[in-house]
């Protein structure tokens, strides 16, 4: 059996029934864009470790068909995962004599530096959002003070907020993806991990603004458009326009979450509590991601200690 035939069967009968739509769509895109053109014509038993490794290295050098530039290591690693999953399934049902994809060497991914807003930039952004007063833009402020991901924010309904207890319950997230006809649609699903399903306390200073926003908003969603969820791309654009209007540096929406975490550590919040609020798998993930913030905090504490004696 040729790899292209198996990939089609694998996607339809193995991935689709057991995966979220987002995962299936992403896998299908990888198969269509990268695996079929390069490996689809080979028989399954012709996919040797040497051949697979050669193709993976080549994707890192010139895998983008449009620009002829290399693909990002994270993208290449996802392609490797699809190759390995598809061939492991083929081996398990005896379509191939050996499983060779486990010998692929993955590209190393450099840890990206966490981007966040400085205290001065945060003050400018907060003031801009408070003066804006649109229910739609209040969500940006909410992320800045709770660490919500953009998908969690857009899927958030007013019924998820307990005004008496000052708590937000996170039980779903939304994302934009293509359906089987190639159209962009919005999917709402439970979070990927159980730790992402969590309850977040709301800072009491935010409650008056939250109540005011609810009075002006007739949508079931906190930042929605009537009964419809705002698309991720549309909301990112709203956020980018606010940054541009107020002379703030361009930073991705996730910088709001990083800013929340950084400020929380600077204020002395313990890592375990922060990890639970962010919905991380465990505190080690939080420590690894925000080690630089902890070091800055440690340095400040040591300087304060030095002032007592020197």
Per-region residue spans from a language model:
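N-terminal core-binding DNA-recognition domain of tyrosine site-specific recombinases/integrases
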Residues: 3-4, 11-95, 111, 229-234, ...
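Short, basic, alpha-helical segments at the C-terminal edge of helix-turn-helix-like DNA-binding modules
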Residues: 303-309
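Catalytic-site neighborhood detector that most strongly recognizes the C-terminal catalytic loop/helix
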Residues: 174, 207, 278-303
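Phosphate-coordinating loops and pocket residues in cytosolic domains that bind phosphorylated ligands
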Residues: 8, 12, 46-49, 61, ...
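Active-site/catalytic core of tyrosine-dependent DNA strand-transfer enzymes
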Residues: 29, 120, 179, 203-249
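Conserved tyrosine-mediated DNA breakage-rejoining catalytic core shared by Y-recombinases
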Residues: 103, 119, 155-212
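C-terminal catalytic core of tyrosine-transesterase DNA break-rejoin enzymes
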Residues: 74, 92, 141, 145-152, ...
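Basic, Lys/Arg- and aromatic-enriched nucleic-acid-binding interface segment
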Residues: 69-73, 77-79, 92-98, 102-156, ...
């Amino acid at each position: 059996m040729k790899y292209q035939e198996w990939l089609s069967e694998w996607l339809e009968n193995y991935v689709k029934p057991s995966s979220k739509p987002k995962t299936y769509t992403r896998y299908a895109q990888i198969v269509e864009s990268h695996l079929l053109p390069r490996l689809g014509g080979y028989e399954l038993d012709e996919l040797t470790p040497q051949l697979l490794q050669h193709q993976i290295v080549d994707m890192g050098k010139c895998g983008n068909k449009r620009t002829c530039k290399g693909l990002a290591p994270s993208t290449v690693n996802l392609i490797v995962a699809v190759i390995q999953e598809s061939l492991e399934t083929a081996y398990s049902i005896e379509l191939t004599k050996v499983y060779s994809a486990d010998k692929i060497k993955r590209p190393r991914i450099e840890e990206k530096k966490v981007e966040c807003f400085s205290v001065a930039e945060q003050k400018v952004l907060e003031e801009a959002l408070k003066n804006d007063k649109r229910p739609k833009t209040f969500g940006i402020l909410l992320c800045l003070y709770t660490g919500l991901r953009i998908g969690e924010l857009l899927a958030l309904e007013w019924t998820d907020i307990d005004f008496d207890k000052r708590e937000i319950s996170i039980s779903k997230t939304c994302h934009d993806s293509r359906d089987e006809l190639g159209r962009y649609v919005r999917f709402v699903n439970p979070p990927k991990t159980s730790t992402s399903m969590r309850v977040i306390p709301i800072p009491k200073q935010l409650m008056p603004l939250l109540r005011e926003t609810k009075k002006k908003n007739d949508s079931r969603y906190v930042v929605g458009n009537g009964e419809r969820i705002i698309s991720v791309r549309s909301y990112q654009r709203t956020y980018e326009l606010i940054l541009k209007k107020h002379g703030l540096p361009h930073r991705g929406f996730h910088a709001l979450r990083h800013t929340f975490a950084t400020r929380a550590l600077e204020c002395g919040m313990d890592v375990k509590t922060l990890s639970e609020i962010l919905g991380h798998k465990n505190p080690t993930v939080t420590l690894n991601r925000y080690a630089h913030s902890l070091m800055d905090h440690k340095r400040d504490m040591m300087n304060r200690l030095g002032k007592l004696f020197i």
